[in-house]
Design a protein with these regions (language model features):
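C-terminal output/effector regions of signal-responsive regulators
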Residues: 128-165
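Conserved phosphotransfer cores of two-component systems
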Residues: 48-50, 75-82
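Conserved sequence signature across two-component system core domains
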Residues: 9-10, 33, 55
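Conserved phosphotransfer microenvironments
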Residues: 53-76
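Short hydrophobic/Thr-rich beta-strand motif most characteristic of the beta2 strand and flanking loop
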Residues: 27-39
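Conserved acidic segment of CheY-like receiver
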Residues: 2-14, 19-23
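Short acidic, S/G/P-rich loop/turn micro-motifs used as interaction or catalytic elements
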Residues: 12-16, 38, 58-65, 92-94, ...
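Alpha4 helix (beta4-alpha4-beta5 surface) of REC/receiver domains from two-component response regulators
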Residues: 71, 86-121
Length: 165
């Protein structure tokens, strides 16, 4: 697996610097946005443009914008249910597990310094599984296309046989 690249969605530059260095120790590269978008609508396009493998999203973004990190995650989930995301919070969210899936992880900020190695391993595993699932999906799509091609060729062959006869 190539170097994994994440997008850190954070409104405090000091946190960006600390977490970027922390995750670099575990072989993960974190990119960030100098200025957060005014709305959540453009985040998925940013993810595609930057070709990121995972996300780390701060829950509180009020120093730059009016929306919250969980709103960003909801918007991204409308387009992609498999990119791994870590939501950093100051407190536990009651219904987080019910709202989001296997590729979402909630972590309290107070725990990140002691658990960053664990989080990095979770990110690596999830990104590996995502890549594997995408390969299986690509094979499945190719098989469906091949099956359809064979069906069409058989149909054409049958019509040609009818014209001969």
């Amino acid at each position: 697996m190539d170097e994994l690249i994440g997008l850190f969605i954070e409104d405090e530059v000091a946190n960006v610097d600390v977490y970027t260095r922390l995750f670099a120790l575990e072989g993960l590269k974190l990119n960030y946005l100098d200025n957060l978008p005014l709305t959540v609508d453009s985040y998925y396009d940013i993810i595609l443009e930057r070709n990121v493998d995972f996300l780390i999203i701060d829950f509180h973004l009020e120093k730059q914008v009016t929306y919250k990190g969980i709103d960003v995650l909801r918007e991204i989930r409308k387009h992609d249910s498999t990119i791994y995301a870590v939501l950093l919070t100051n407190y536990e969210l009651d219904d987080f597990a019910d709202q989001f899936g296997d590729y979402d992880y909630e972590l309290q900020k107070s725990e990140i310094n002691s658990r960053y190695k664990d989080v990095a391993e979770k990110i690596k595993r999830a990104c590996g599984l995502r890549e594997e699932n995408m390969m299986y999906r690509a094979v499945e799509i190719k098989q469906q296309q091949d099956t359809e091609t064979i069906r069409l060729l058989q149909e054409i062959n049958s019509k040609l046989d009818q014209k001969k006869g």
